Amino acid sequence: MKYNVDTVRESGWYNKKEWLAVRDYVRQRDKMTCVRCGAFGAKKYEVDHIVELTWENLDDWNIALNPDNLQLLCKSCHNKKTSEYKRGKGVSLW
């Protein structure tokens, strides 16, 4: 099955206590600042997986819940990264 973020959201994965804890840690670590463009305190931001989640790696802590694989992006930068990934260019390691 192909990974779909909406399906994962519907499954409750993003409500797990483990995800919520690491998400909050990354927000603090990155000081509510987009690591790509430097936007500070934007209302809309995403804790982004550098190595994209797939159904195959969703249960792999080193990918799904490892702070070293997470970064804070503003919505604009996150959308650009996601579009690039979907076009088949792979993951940008900004």
Swiss-Prot record:
GO terms for molecular function: endonuclease activity; nucleic acid binding; zinc ion binding. InterPro entries: HNH, HNH_nuc. Keywords: Endonuclease, Hydrolase, Nuclease. CDD domains: HNHc. The keyword Oxidoreductase does not apply. Its EC number is 3.1.-.-. Belongs to the skunalikevirus HNH endonuclease family. Probable HNH endonuclease. PANTHER family: HNH NUCLEASE YAJD-RELATED. This is Probable HNH endonuclease.
